[in-house]
Amino acid sequence: MRLHRFFLPFSATDNSLIIADEKIVNQIKNVLRLKDGDEILIFNGEKERKGKIEEIAKNAIRIILKEEVINLRESKIKVKLFCSLLKKDNFELVVQKATEVGVKEIYPIISKRTVKFDFKKERMDKIIKEASEQSMRISLPILHQTISFQEALKESSQNQLNVFCDLSSPLFSETLKEKLISKKIDSLGVFIGPEGGWSEEEIHLAKDNNFLMVKLSDLVFRSETAAIVAVYLFSHLLANND
């Protein structure tokens, strides 16, 4: 049976820990109805260990930490998502699904046609933690503060490849796929525009920076759909070429 996972801080020398977080205690006691002796998984963003519930008290739970679990699910490809800020629910969906498919860093960007200019960091961090627990990944993606499109271009210069998703660009094809997987790439940037699309100036700047210009489909995707499709498609192709 698959063990339930929880994101909790612990150090390499810890043999036990006390869970005092009210929400986690409630989840273990009243939602999952776990009992003394049941095993769970604990991860801290770097390592994962098995844990055994030793005692469930009224407001806290004592866990005995056991052996480390070797997790081979994490991709070796460092994928960074540069996504224009979207309306609240749509951007939350992007953050959740990007976490689930293994994105390492998320950069909310302000582009010319962006209509949303801020987000609730605390809410997003909660979404990231829960998506990491569910998807069985160990590391949590880094959610950066909002940056401008120009700042995103500078940040993306560290990547071996940057993919710019745009409806006016060539359709992703088998030829492009073969060209892509023939390269040894371990860092990838994926750029997703706002609801109103990229401006002509932004498209030209992406071309000037030698971005791979791609239309994902002949169908017109919403921005949040494009983000999920793109990060999975390109990270999957490159990971399979590893």
Put a short name on every predicted segment.
Residues 40, 64, 70, 74-81, ...:
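Mobile, glycine- and charge-enriched loop segments
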Residues 40, 140-144, 213:
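Generic structural signal for residues in well-ordered beta-strands
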Residues 72-164:
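RNA substrate-binding interface of SAM-dependent RNA methyltransferases
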Residues 1-70:
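N-terminal positively charged helical leader segments and presequences
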Residues 200-242:
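Structured adenosyl-cofactor binding patch, chiefly the S-adenosyl-L-methionine
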Residues 162-205, 209-215:
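Active-site/ligand-binding-proximal alpha/beta "capping" segment
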Residues 11, 68, 111-114, 218-219:
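Short, ordered loop/turn segments at secondary-structure junctions
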